[in-house]
């Protein structure tokens, strides 16, 4: 990497053109020079949504724990896309507190999905279902990173599993918004080692009315390798839905 390129990107990060600033922080993350971290962090507070979105993604690429507080603050950003990118970035930071924050998000801060009405005394806010779904997905991506806590720590795996199963337990079917959280939770469970409880929960979701809940459930069951899934998957292999038929057939091939 040339010094000239670094200097150019550092200058562009302060450019009057928002698109230039956004491209600059992504460029700084790509070259991974430590000198690019601080300017990227500053741009997370840019007045333009597009720039903040890029900065959040870039900070995830850097994976530097010094961005933790700013990214947590970004979860309250006025832009939902910035919130989403900040949560994704937290999933890329390989430290215990970033993992803890993702668990907190998936778990709704320990509060019920219904909000404050049934919340413990002193509770002030809940996380949006969309952000909880993003956090659930971020856990799955984290589990795919070689050497990460979710790839190596039994304690972290169990904490994630409990949070994801509890999120699924809030779902009574029919709620489109919660279905997105369930889909994300099942997708991530498919990246974790299975146990009988998880397999049972996912098997029940094969009958859900939302296609993506069913799709990710099929994929997770194929990963789990539990032969209890064979019979229900054989039924889905006869589904009228072509995509479901193909997924179920592929899962059966993996289980046989």
Predicted stretch roles:
Residues 16-17, 47-48, 78-79, 109-110, ...:
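Short inter-helical turns and helix N-cap capping residues of alpha-solenoid HEAT/ARM repeat scaffolds
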Residues 2-12, 33-45, 64-76, 95-120, ...:
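Amphipathic alpha-helical scaffolding segments comprising HEAT/armadillo-like alpha-solenoid repeats
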Residues 124-131, 153, 174-181:
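Helix-start/N-cap signature of alpha-helical segments
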Residues 234-256:
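Eukaryotic acidic, Ser/Thr-rich intrinsically disordered low-complexity regions
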């Amino acid at each position: 990497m040339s010094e000239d390129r670094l200097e150019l990107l550092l200058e562009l990060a302060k450019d009057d053109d928002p698109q230039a600033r956004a491209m600059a922080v992504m460029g700084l993350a790509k070259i991974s020079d430590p000198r690019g971290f601080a300017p990227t962090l500053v741009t997370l507070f840019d007045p333009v949504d597009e720039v903040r979105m890029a900065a959040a993604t870039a900070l995830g690429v850097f994976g530097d724990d010094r961005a933790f507080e700013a990214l947590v603050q970004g979860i309250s950003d006025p832009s939902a896309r910035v919130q989403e990118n900040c949560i994704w970035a937290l999933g890329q930071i390989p430290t215990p507190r970033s993992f803890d924050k993702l668990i907190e998000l998936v778990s709704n801060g320990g509060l019920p999905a219904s909000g404050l009405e049934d919340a413990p005394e002193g509770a002030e806010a809940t996380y949006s279902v969309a952000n909880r779904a993003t956090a659930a997905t971020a856990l799955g991506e984290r589990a795919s990173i070689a050497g990460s806590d979710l790839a190596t720590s039994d304690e972290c795996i169990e904490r994630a599993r409990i949070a994801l199963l509890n999120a699924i337990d809030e779902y009574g079917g029919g709620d489109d918004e919660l279905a997105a959280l369930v889909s994300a939770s099942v997708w991530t469970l498919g990246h974790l080692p299975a146990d009988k409880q998880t397999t049972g929960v996912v098997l029940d979701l094969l009958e859900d009315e939302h296609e993506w809940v069913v799709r990710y459930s099929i994929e997770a069951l194929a990963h789990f390798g539990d032969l209890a899934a064979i019979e229900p998957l054989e039924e889905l292999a006869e589904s009228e839905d072509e995509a479901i038929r193909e997924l179920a057939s592929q899962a059966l091939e993996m289980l046989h």
